[in-house]
Amino acid sequence: MHKIIRVLALVYASSVSDTAMVQAADHQTKPTIVLVHGAFAESSSWNDVIAQLNRHGYRTIAAANPLRSVAGDAAAVSSVIRSLQGPVVLVGHSYGGPVITEAAHGKSNVKALVYVAGFAPDTGESSLSLSGQFPGSTLSDALLPLARPDGGKELYIQQEKFHEQFAADVPAARANLMAATQRPVTEAALAEPSNAASWKTIPSYAIYGSADRNIPPAVMKFMADRAHAVKTIVIDGASHALMVSHPGEVAALIEEAAKAP
C-alpha cells in the first residue's frame, strides 16, 4: 500500500512539474502587453482588461504615464520596453496613443500597436490638432484648468461632468471613483507635436466607441484608415472609457494583435 502511495505521489509530482514547465514555456513565448493610460485616467483603468489577459497567460504591465509631455512620457515608457525581453505589444488609450507611437520608435521588439480610443498622430501632429479636424468633441467645456508655477496649465475634467463626458456607459458609482482619482495632463502635452509615426512601420489595431465625447469618432476612423489598421472595431454606444465599459472586447483585440505572425 505504501509503495502504491509513493508511486502515485511521484506520478502526481511529475504531472505538476510538467504542467508548470508547459505554462512557463507558454508564458515566455507570448508577448508582454504594456498598457499606457491617457489623460484624466490612471493605471487601474486597465484592471478588467488585465484580468482577462492574465487569465489567458499574458504578462501585463500597466505603465504609469506621467502626462507631462509627449517626449518625456514616451521616454518613461521606452525605459519599460528596454527592460523587457522578447516581443512587446503596446496599448495606448487616448493621449496614451501619441506616447506609445513615439515610444515604439526604433524598438525592434515592439510587434504591434493597439489604439484604444487613442490618438495615432503623424509626425508634427498633436492630440489637439487631430481632435479639431472633425467636429464632435465636447471636452473643452468640461475641463477644469489649474495654473502651474511655470505659467502653463494643468487640466482636469470637472468631477460633476466626468460621468457624462468621459464614461457615460460606466455605472455612476464607478465613474465617480474614476473622477476622483483622475490624473491631470498638462495643456502643453496635448499641444505637443509628435516626433515619430511608428504606425507606418509597425502593425496597428484600433478600437473605439461611437459615442465618444472626448475624441470625435470621425477622427479615430480617419487615423485608423490612414494607418491601414489591421483591424478596426467600433463599439456602438461606447464612451471614451471603453477599456472600463467593454474590457472583453478590448482584451480580445489585444490578444489578436499578440497572436498575429
Regions found by a protein language model. Name each.
Residues A238-P247:
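Catalytic histidine-centered segment of alpha/beta-hydrolase-like enzymes
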Residues S210-A238:
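Conserved loop-alpha-helix segment in the C-terminal half of the alpha/beta-hydrolase fold
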Residues T29-V70, V88, G106:
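Conserved HGGG/HGGXW glycine-rich cap/lid loop of the alpha/beta-hydrolase fold
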Residues A206-Y208:
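Short beta-strand/loop motif that positions the catalytic acidic residue
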Residues L177-S198:
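Active-site nucleophile elbow and catalytic-triad environment of alpha/beta-hydrolase enzymes
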Residues V91-G92, G96, I100:
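Gly/Ala-rich beta-loop-alpha elbow adjacent to hydrolase catalytic centers
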Residues P31, W199-S204, A227-V230:
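Short, proline-enriched alpha-helix->beta-strand connector loops that line the catalytic pocket
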Residues N109-V110, V114-D150, L155, Q159, ...:
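Flexible "cap/lid" loop of the alpha/beta hydrolase fold
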